[in-house]
A protein has these predicted regions:
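Short, flexible loop segments at boundaries between secondary-structure elements
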Residues: 280-307, 438-462, 466
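Cap/lid and interdomain-hinge subdomains that line or gate substrate/regulatory clefts
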Residues: 36-50, 80-82, 93-122, 126-259, ...
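Short acidic, glycine/serine/threonine-rich loops at helix termini
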Residues: 58-61, 133-137, 167-175, 260-265, ...
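Conserved, well-structured core segments that form the ligand-binding/active-site neighborhood
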Residues: 173-357
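N-terminal basic/disordered segments at the start of proteins
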Residues: 9-79, 164
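C-terminal structural cap/anchor segments
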Residues: 358-419
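N-terminal short beta-loop-beta anion/metal-coordinating cradle
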Residues: 57-87, 356-362, 437-455
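A structural-propensity feature for long, helix-poor, extended segments
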Residues: 82-90, 448-484
């Protein structure tokens, strides 16, 4: 059942082992993915508005759009898939830009939906470490749906879990796996994000914090592992069905079965008339779409490369990415080039610096794999918006470099490391408009996109979040791509 909560200042909990975190929990209630697929068959299409491209990491054979023209949305609605993604990239925008982009997508989607006769339900995909424009995005989606005649939103369901990456929620407290064990996300480097920082790991208090007190922690409905595992889908559907007036519910999950119980409950509640919006991490999408976890793509499934060497673009500056780069260097066979942030911020040097790096990298690509990366030390502005503007400028420079390199020499593959980096590389450097997310290179992480048309057709595009995988993950992904 829902449980009352009492917001307090967060007390650091520190690390604990995963075994300690999971000890004493109720037995998992097994739900096959096929049961969810049957429950949603013929129902509303799940449309995921992805605030950066890394939300596709848990799914396979799902359409992805990087543009939201009505024709593109109609194409996605016609595909034989229980869900599709629209890459909004709003995590890289300020609040006003994010709000306007969400409005544009919903208005075009409503038109496309009516033209195709296919109804939909919306999920706003945010970061599993709780960064992004919440509650702004779900507020805008609710307003636009109401304006389109879809009625008011009964509830907003927050499900940040990302199972493969070790982002787990237990007793409404959200944890992340680290090299030292499980850590509450509010004590991680991601909680200190210059743009989307926060203090609380406990989701009801996090909701109160992010809504600036508009929603109190005591008013947040908590759906716990006891609800999911002991009482099951019908009970949880009742909790969801009781939501009114856009009330927020937060949901525990430590495994895919928990999310499939939730998916069944959501389908039941929706079939009974509940109008729900979802703010979710990557794992909920797979469960709600009725997909089971799939093995990573094999070298044979990737097919023969069209060129001898690949390009790796690295924009993420988090510590994990830096360690992954170190391991990739140890593997050898790389030429590495840096875009210096200080030179990029100098209007007199910027263009020449990008041109110099691009020319050298394109030449090296004929001989070996190439890494083009930004300065590893993050440069911040005076406030959150200024920091975001610097990030956008650096990302734009990386995009210019990738565009120039690939125009000169076709790579065997392109890996984009970091959320903003992977979005801008897809849309601006490679001009990907429609693609299929075919699967992952590593278990549950690192999505491979197959562009449908355009200059990137035939080039595997790998979306690699800055904050996922072990220290060897980038080297492992490159090793697989080299083995084709």
């Amino acid at each position: 059942m829902s449980h009352p909560t009492h917001p307090t200042a967060p007390v650091p909990l520190g690390h604990r082992t995963e075994a300690e975190l999971l000890a004493g929990l109720p037995p998992v209630r097994a739900v096959p993915a096929g049961e969810v697929a049957a429950a949603i068959s013929g129902g509303r299409r799940l449309v995921v508005l992805d605030d950066d491209p890394t939300g596709t990491q848990t799914v396979a054979d799902v359409p992805v759009l990087t543009d939201w023209a009505v024709d593109d949305l109609r194409w996605a609605l016609r595909q034989d898939s229980g869900a599709f993604f629209v890459l909004t990239n709003t995590r890289s925008l300020d609040a006003a830009g994010a709000a306007e982009r969400n409005r544009q997508v919903v208005r075009a989607l409503v038109e496309a939906s009516r033209a195709e006769g296919v109804d939909f339900v919306l999920a706003s995909r945010g970061d599993s470490t709780l960064r992004g424009h919440f509650p702004l995005e779900t507020d805008v989606l609710a307003d636009e749906l109401a304006a389109a005649g879809a009625g008011g939103t009964d509830g907003v369901v927050v499900v940040p879990a990302y199972i493969e990456a070790g982002r787990l929620t237990v007793d409404s407290l959200h944890w992340m796996r680290t090299a030292d064990g499980m850590l509450p996300v509010g004590e991680s480097e991601f909680a200190r994000d210059a743009t989307f920082g926060y203090a609380h790991s406990r989701l009801p208090e996090w909701v109160e914090e992010k809504t600036a007190g508009r929603t109190l922690a005591v008013d947040v409905v908590r759906i716990t592992l006891d609800d999911l595992r002991v009482h099951g889908p019908e009970h949880v559907a009742g909790l969801l069905g009781a939501l009114r007036g856009g009330r927020t519910a937060v949901v525990d999950a430590t495994c895919d079965d928990d999310l499939r119980v939730l998916a069944l409950a959501c389908a039941l509640a929706e079939s009974r008339g509940s109008r729900l919006l979802y703010r979710v991490g990557p794992s909920f999408v797979r469960a709600r779409a009725g997909q089971a976890a799939r093995a990573p793509l094999s070298a044979a499934e990737l097919g023969a490369p069209a060129a001898p060497h690949g390009l790796i673009a690295v924009g993420s500056h988090v510590g994990l990415t830096t360690r992954q780069l170190d391991r990739l260097r140890e593997a050898g066979g790389l030429a590495e080039f840096e875009l210096d942030v200080r030179q990029l911020m100098d209007d007199e040097r910027r263009a020449a610096h990008i041109a110099e790096v691009s020319e050298a990298a394109a030449g090296a690509l004929a001989i070996q794999d190439v890494v083009v990366r930004t300065t590893r030390t993050v440069v911040t502005g005076a406030d959150a918006d200024a920091s975001l503007a610097i990030s956008r400028g650096v990302s734009a420079a990386l995009v210019e470099a990738v565009r120039a390199i690939t125009a000169t020499r076709t790579p065997a593959f392109v890996i984009a490391k970091g959320g903003i980096t992977s979005s801008d590389t897809a849309t601006e450097a490679l001009e990907i408009r429609r693609a299929w997310a075919r699967g992952t290179l590593l278990p549950g992480i690192v999505s491979l996109w197959e562009p449908v048309a355009g200059p990137a057709a035939g080039i595997p595009y790998i979306v690699f979040a800055g904050n996922v995988g072990g220290d060897d993950a980038l080297a492992d992904a490159v090793r697989l791509l080299r083995s084709r």
